[in-house]
């Protein structure tokens, strides 16, 4: 039976939500009611699959905490008042912490003046952010296109590469096995996870995948494409594969790929949506090898965990294909004043507080602790790896990974798996995590592994 629209129901629901937004605290009955509502509405109106996913990694087999507010820069508080150290970081968006006061203040100040742009007049913050990114990014990167997410940033990069290379007769893209570049149609064509790809086949033609970190395979693919007339427009890579399981390539790999791109006349697109903005101990992961891409993709942490924003930054030579018609690729909300205010404040915080260097220092401390645990629990842990504050613990099988996430939840530390590698639990906290909190995370991981070993022995 078709359901008739109900303005009265929608009005009541929106009014109830606005009342919740105004509240700072909930009493016990309000908390219980909100939990019930959220679970019901996820099941009936969002996607019940999300409930089952959270159930698999949450203490007691429950649906998990209903988040309520940030506890501090590095913690989350649920509706029951439980505080969690955030070692997931919203999949990499909270590099400067939760509700960083500098970022929040910038957004509030802009909101008091003008929240969105007119689309016709020139908006100053978009210009200032583009100038700032031109100064911040490596090499000859100069012009920025702004959007709202990582997958949009990748879509723009692919279209930009096509527009530049099509007159040169180059239409092929090379990506890598294990890659994750997003789930919109173009980005998904570069993504390498069959689970995400198969339901939407056929994807865009002209994409090939080679093993990540294997420079000989990259050379072979470029040569074969040249022989068959399928000349390569661009190679698209993550400097470190995040959703693939925090996979680091061999030293010198990015440098070698850059040389091959130059040799074959292919553009180099670096997807730093997850590795950028100080995450790996440098402002951008490509700086570890002083590699300069032709196109750089950013998002996630660019908005400081306050506003969604993505950016595609390119050299003048490449970006100039859009000069004659700047409307070839645009978005309504891309580069809006609130998002640009958040991004400018985020960059300011990262530089003023030298957070990339802090990420290197605290990341080394955490990784040393996790590697020690891997030595103590070889029956459970296969490897701990990472760079800066992008780390992973890989377990001997998927089930142990889920159990670890559940045990860490009991210890009030929030972690989760990676999308392309179910055996791997990602550790991706805010770069503002304190030394004391780092120690608590390692202690919680030790307790979690000890409890898991007891469970295995008793089984």
Curated annotation (Swiss-Prot):
<feature type="binding site" description="in other chain">
    <location>
        <position position="274"/>
    </location>
    <ligand>
        <name>pyridoxal 5'-phosphate</name>
    </ligand>
</feature>
<comment type="function">
    <text>Catalyzes the aminotransferase reaction from putrescine to 2-oxoglutarate, leading to glutamate and 4-aminobutanal, which spontaneously cyclizes to form 1-pyrroline. This is the first step in one of two pathways for putrescine degradation, where putrescine is converted into 4-aminobutanoate (gamma-aminobutyrate or GABA) via 4-aminobutanal. Also functions as a cadaverine transaminase in a a L-lysine degradation pathway to succinate that proceeds via cadaverine, glutarate and L-2-hydroxyglutarate.</text>
</comment>
<dbReference type="InterPro" id="IPR050103">
    <property type="entry name" value="Class-III_PLP-dep_AT"/>
</dbReference>
<dbReference type="GO" id="GO:0019477">
    <property type="term" value="P:L-lysine catabolic process"/>
</dbReference>
<feature type="binding site" description="in other chain">
    <location>
        <begin position="150"/>
        <end position="151"/>
    </location>
    <ligand>
        <name>pyridoxal 5'-phosphate</name>
    </ligand>
</feature>
<protein>
    <recommendedName>
        <fullName>Putrescine aminotransferase</fullName>
        <ecNumber>2.6.1.82</ecNumber>
        <ecNumber>2.6.1.29</ecNumber>
    </recommendedName>
</protein>
<comment type="pathway">
    <text>Amine and polyamine degradation; putrescine degradation; 4-aminobutanal from putrescine (transaminase route): step 1/1.</text>
</comment>
<keyword id="KW-0032">Aminotransferase</keyword>
<dbReference type="GO" id="GO:0042802">
    <property type="term" value="F:identical protein binding"/>
</dbReference>
<dbReference type="GO" id="GO:0019161">
    <property type="term" value="F:diamine transaminase activity"/>
</dbReference>
<dbReference type="InterPro" id="IPR005814">
    <property type="entry name" value="Aminotrans_3"/>
</dbReference>
<keyword id="KW-0808">Transferase</keyword>
<dbReference type="GO" id="GO:0033094">
    <property type="term" value="F:putrescine--2-oxoglutarate transaminase activity"/>
</dbReference>
<dbReference type="InterPro" id="IPR015421">
    <property type="entry name" value="PyrdxlP-dep_Trfase_major"/>
</dbReference>
<feature type="modified residue" description="N6-(pyridoxal phosphate)lysine">
    <location>
        <position position="300"/>
    </location>
</feature>
<dbReference type="InterPro" id="IPR015422">
    <property type="entry name" value="PyrdxlP-dep_Trfase_small"/>
</dbReference>
<dbReference type="InterPro" id="IPR049704">
    <property type="entry name" value="Aminotrans_3_PPA_site"/>
</dbReference>
<dbReference type="GO" id="GO:0009447">
    <property type="term" value="P:putrescine catabolic process"/>
</dbReference>
<comment type="similarity">
    <text>Belongs to the class-III pyridoxal-phosphate-dependent aminotransferase family. Putrescine aminotransferase subfamily.</text>
</comment>
<dbReference type="InterPro" id="IPR017747">
    <property type="entry name" value="Putrescine_aminotransferase"/>
</dbReference>
<dbReference type="InterPro" id="IPR015424">
    <property type="entry name" value="PyrdxlP-dep_Trfase"/>
</dbReference>
<dbReference type="GO" id="GO:0030170">
    <property type="term" value="F:pyridoxal phosphate binding"/>
</dbReference>
<feature type="binding site">
    <location>
        <position position="332"/>
    </location>
    <ligand>
        <name>pyridoxal 5'-phosphate</name>
    </ligand>
</feature>
<dbReference type="Pfam" id="PF00202">
    <property type="entry name" value="Aminotran_3"/>
</dbReference>
<keyword id="KW-0663">Pyridoxal phosphate</keyword>
């Amino acid at each position: 039976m078709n359901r008739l629209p109900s303005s009265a129901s929608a009005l009541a629901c929106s009014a109830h939500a606005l009342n919740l937004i105004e509240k700072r605290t909930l009493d016990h009955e309000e908390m219980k009611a909100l939990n019930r509502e959220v679970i019901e509405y996820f099941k009936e109106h969002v996607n019940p699959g999300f409930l089952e996913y959270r159930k698999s990694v949450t203490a007691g087999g429950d649906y998990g905490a209903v988040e309520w507010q940030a506890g501090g820069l590095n913690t989350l508080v649920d509706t029951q008042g439980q505080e969690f150290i955030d070692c997931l970081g919203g999949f990499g968006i909270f590099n400067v912490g939760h509700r960083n006061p500098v970022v929040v203040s910038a957004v509030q100040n802009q909101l008091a003046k003008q929240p969105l742009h007119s689309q016709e007049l020139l908006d100053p913050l978009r210009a200032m952010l583009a100038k700032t990114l031109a100064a911040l990014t490596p090499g000859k990167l100069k012009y920025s296109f702004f959007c709202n997410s990582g997958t949009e940033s990748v879509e723009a990069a692919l279209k930009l590469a096509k527009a530049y290379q099509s007159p040169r007769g180059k239409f092929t893209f090379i990506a890598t096995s294990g890659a994750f570049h997003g789930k919109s149609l173009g980005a998904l064509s570069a993504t390498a996870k069959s689970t995400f790809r198969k339901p939407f086949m056929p994807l865009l033609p002209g994409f090939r995948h080679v093993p990540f970190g294997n420079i000989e395979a990259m050379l072979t693919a470029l040569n074969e494409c040249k022989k068959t007339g399928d000349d390569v427009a661009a190679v698209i890579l993550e400097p470190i594969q995040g959703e693939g399981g925090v996979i680091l390539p061999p030293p010198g790999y990015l440098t070698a790929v850059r040389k091959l791109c130059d040799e074959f006349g292919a553009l180099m697109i670096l997807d730093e949506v997850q590795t950028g903005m100080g995450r790996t101990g440098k402002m951008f992961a490509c700086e570890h090898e002083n590699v300069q891409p032709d196109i750089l993709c950013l998002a996630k942490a660019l908005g400081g965990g306050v506003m969604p924003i993505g950016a595609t930054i390119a050299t003048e030579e490449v970006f100039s294909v859009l000069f004659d018609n700047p409307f070839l690729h645009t978005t309504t909300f891309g580069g809006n004043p609130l998002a640009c205010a958040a991004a400018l404040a985020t960059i300011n915080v990262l530089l003023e507080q030298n957070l990339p260097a802090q990420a290197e220092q605290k990341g080394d401390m955490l990784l040393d602790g996790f590697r020690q645990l891997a030595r103590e629990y070889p029956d459970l842990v296969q490897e701990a790896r990472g760079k800066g504050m992008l780390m992973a613990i890989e377990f001997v099988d998927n089930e142990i990974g889920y159990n670890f996430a559940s045990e860490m939840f009991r210890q009030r530390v929030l972690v989760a798996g990676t999308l392309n590698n179910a055996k791997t639990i990602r550790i991706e906290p805010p770069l503002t995590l304190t030394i004391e909190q780092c120690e608590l995370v390692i202690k919680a991981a030790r307790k979690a592994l000890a409890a898991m070993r007891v469970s295995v022995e008793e089984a």
